[in-house]
Amino acid sequence: QVFGEGMFDYDLFPFLTSTVSPHYRHGLLRGFMDSGISEVRSDRDRFTINLDVKHFSPDDLTVKILDDFVEIHGKHSERQDDHGYISREFHRRYRLPSNLDQSSISCSLSADGILTFSGPKMMSNLVSSHSERPIPVSREEKPTSAPSS
């Protein structure tokens, strides 16, 4: 899921990519966070989602809780880049733990484009409220280190 990253010589001429093997592809060796995969951690005390949204600003993102789910939506209008014009949009939906303290949830966007949605868990399993609630996205100045696998 690497959209809008442009094409490279090895994308157009894969037979010129490697002397190691004709089947070797540089594009397959991209880092974890460049893959578009999110990281969800749920331990005893905390629930956290890390998502690479480097092509979006906080104004392009909407994060809201709807019943027992968090919905993350990103969309930006058509922009010019090095390779032409591009627009991007995504939707992600994650089920929240029943014991998540929804009143203490935070959401921030790091300088390197990692969106972190996080909240503490309560000791008792209280019934979550079934309503829609927006979660503001704050901007951080420091980059987020890559999540551990």
From Swiss-Prot:
It holds the Pfam family HSP20. It comes from the Eukaryota. Its main location: cytoplasm. GO terms for biological process: lens development in camera-type eye; negative regulation of apoptotic process; protein refolding; response to heat. The keyword Cytoplasm applies. InterPro entries: A-crystallin/Hsp20_dom (IPR002068), Alpha-crystallin/sHSP_animal (IPR001436), Alpha-crystallin_N (IPR003090), HSP20-like_chaperone (IPR008978). One of its GO terms (molecular function) is metal ion binding. Zn(2+) 2 binds at H76, E78, H83. Zn(2+) 1 binds at H55, H76, E78, H83, H91. It is found in: Cytoplasm; Nucleus. Zn(2+) 3 binds at H130. Keywords: Cytoplasm, Eye lens protein, Glycoprotein, Metal-binding, Nucleus, Zinc. SUPFAM superfamilies: HSP20-like chaperones. Glycans are attached at S138. One of its GO terms (cellular component) is cytoplasm. Residues 125-149 are annotated as: Disordered. Residues 130-143 have a biased composition (Basic and acidic residues). Residues 28-138 form the sHSP domain. Heteropolymer composed of three CRYAA and one CRYAB subunits. Inter-subunit bridging via zinc ions enhances stability, which is crucial as there is no protein turn over in the lens. Can also form homodimers and homotetramers (dimers of dimers) which serve as the building blocks of homooligomers. Within homooligomers, the zinc-binding motif is created from residues of 3 different molecules. His-76 and Glu-78 from one molecule are ligands of the zinc ion, and His-83 and His-130 residues from additional molecules complete the site with tetrahedral coordination geometry. Contributes to the transparency and refractive index of the lens. May act as a chaperone, preventing aggregation of various proteins under a wide range of stress conditions. Belongs to the small heat shock protein (HSP20) family. This is Alpha-crystallin A chain. It comes from Rana temporaria.
